Amino acid sequence: MPESPEVQALAEFLAEHAVSRRIETVDLDEFRALKTRDRPLAELDGATITGIRRFGKHLDLQTDAAHLVISFGRAGWARWDGEAAPDDAPVIARMPLNGALLELTDAGDWLSLGLSVVDDPLEVAALAKLGPDPLDEAFDRAALDRAVTGRRKQLKALLQEQETLAGIGNAYSDEILHAAKLSPLAHGSALDADERERLFLAVTTTLRDAVAARRGIPPYRLKEAKVAAMRVHGRAGEACPVCADTILDHDAVASWQYCPTCEAAG
């Protein structure tokens, strides 16, 4: 699942390579991906890309005609100008850009990529409901406190709730809780001030360090860079890099990993 650090890196890449290019057309191979049936993709034919902005795990492609909001969902992604791809993800949409090509793919068993043509990105319900984004410069300890204080919900689920904090998914929530030394099963309401401080520092440091590490990497390599950087997520059975205990897997609705020694608090 694309999460905010990789989507931010993609946004910066496209800001450098796609802005000021003209969209020749948008060829859609899977009609279900278009979520705004009353706003066809043809509205973008001939439009010039004027900006790229990230909203949580979503991308807003701004043009002089309309906005194209790209919701990557569970397995959507982008491919630039015919670059090599590490997987055979089906291409859902193609956008020739006068001399370049932007392709949108989806590698999932079911289609999760969504495209919306709108005048304002906040017309997309998922964007309008987003909570504060830890990658925003304005995000501070008070914003984190408001997000978790009094919440009788497990931290693992709370961190992934987009209305609470924007941009965090399964992988980075594992990394954040490991860095904060907090149990994924602890409730937000159970955290004391020191634990909330640890969580705040882990959230901001983990995500911002990830953005810095992904910056400049071409889109097709961002997923493998993310996987390689994980310290606990996806590493069940390996030694914890902090305490050397064995990382365990919790296989519920979605598999997630944790260190039973480091993450015993909360």
Q: Whereabouts are the PLM-identified features?
A:
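Basic, nucleic-acid-binding surfaces and adjacent catalytic neighborhoods in DNA/RNA-processing proteins
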Residues: 22-40, 53, 145-266
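Phosphate/anion-contacting hairpin/loop surfaces
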Residues: 64-167, 172-179
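Short clusters of hydrophobic/aromatic residues that line enzyme substrate/ligand-binding pockets
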Residues: 44, 127-130, 182, 233
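Gly/Gly-Pro- and Ser/Thr-rich, intrinsically disordered tail segments characteristic of DNA damage-repair
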Residues: 1-113, 121, 249
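Generic detection of long, well-ordered alpha-helical segments
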Residues: 1-4, 134, 138, 192-200
